[in-house]
């Protein structure tokens, strides 16, 4: 029985899933808007939102935890210097998922994942 088991496997090994969501989170924080499949977008929330919550309290330990989860010094800097301050008063719900139709090749449901209160402008980066 599958009772109380959370998370989607997405037809990947655990190491592949971990690497994929790490890369997607880095792309999301870099561009603030990405386009991906709907199931991946929903699972990305579980990775990205805790990182923003972590960035609200700036400490060396939190920076090291964020680096451990993103492996990017530039993104850690943006998280703590920009995003942590931007969402200091918001109690969660940092991401918005917008459905945007279906992919041409396999009819997979697609979605935009964007940071709430982001500066408007720019193009979506595809993270498939």
UniProtKB/Swiss-Prot annotation:
Q: Does the keyword Ribonucleoprotein apply?
A: yes
State any GO BP term from the record: translation
Q: Which UniProt keywords apply?
A: Ribonucleoprotein, Ribosomal protein
Say if the entry is tagged with keyword Cell inner membrane.
Answer: no
Q: Which GO terms describe its molecular function?
A: structural constituent of ribosome
* InterPro entries listed in its UniProt record: Ribosomal_bL17, Ribosomal_bL17_CS, Ribosomal_bL17_sf
Q: What cellular component terms from Gene Ontology apply here? A: cytosolic large ribosomal subunit
SUPFAM superfamilies documented for this protein: Prokaryotic ribosomal protein L17
Spell out the PROSITE patterns in the cross-references: RIBOSOMAL_L17
Its family? Belongs to the bacterial ribosomal protein bL17 family.
Q: How does it assemble?
A: Part of the 50S ribosomal subunit. Contacts protein L32.
Looking up HAMAP family in the UniProt record yields: Ribosomal_bL17
The entry's protein name is: Large ribosomal subunit protein bL17
């Amino acid at each position: 029985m599958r009772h109380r088991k959370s998370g989607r496997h997405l037809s990947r090994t655990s190491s592949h899933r971990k690497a994929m969501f790490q890369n997607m989170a880095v792309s999301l924080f870099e561009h603030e808007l990405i386009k991906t499949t709907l199931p991946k977008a929903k699972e990305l929330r579980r990775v990205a939102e805790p990182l923003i919550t972590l960035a609200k309290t700036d400490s060396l330990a939190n920076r090291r935890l964020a680096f451990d989860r993103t492996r990017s010094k530039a993104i850690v800097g943006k998280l703590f210097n920009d995003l942590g301050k931007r969402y200091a008063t918001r109690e969660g719900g940092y991401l918005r998922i917008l459905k945007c139709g279906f992919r041409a090749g396999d009819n997979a449901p697609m979605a935009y994942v964007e940071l709430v209160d982001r500066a408007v402008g720019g193009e979506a980066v595809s993270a498939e």
